[in-house]
Amino acid sequence: MEREQDTARYIALALDLGAADAVPFTPDDIVFEPRTILKCMFGCEDWGKGPTCPSRTGSLMPWEYEPLLRRYRWGLIVHSPDKKTAQEASFAIEQRAFVDGYYLAFSMSDCACCPECVGLKGKPCAYPKKARPAFHSVGIDVFATARGMGLPIQTLASEDEPQNWYAAVWVE
């Protein structure tokens, strides 16, 4: 009963913060796919620069996250057409869950803390306690996961098209 109540409160929090959707998941709902690193390595101009990306020294490789994340029993997927909203909602849920006793709660979201990432310029991250790895950078197929949960996502022909941003909060 407590989990159901907490889930409902966290969903309400995400929606109150502007998320379009917040959907509960178990690790079995998440599609782990180590090939996601190829999109980072050969599709991201920030490869080797981002303070939360898998290219940074000492970072786990995407396929090394799966056994860690499978130890969680449940969490929430947060969807928003706005990257910053997805990050802020997921981080707020992580903080609330921690206060509620879920001390290992952990959020993942494309970082939108700064208008322009200072880490990409070789400077220390301005928000090291808030910056998190992107959902896809840890070996998760965001497209297959979102589609499996009935959430909207498609490839875009242009960056001007409406976007779907996803974050995850691993609660317990």
Where do the model's predicted regions map?
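Auxiliary alpha/beta "docking" domains used to position bulky ligands
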Residues: M1-E172
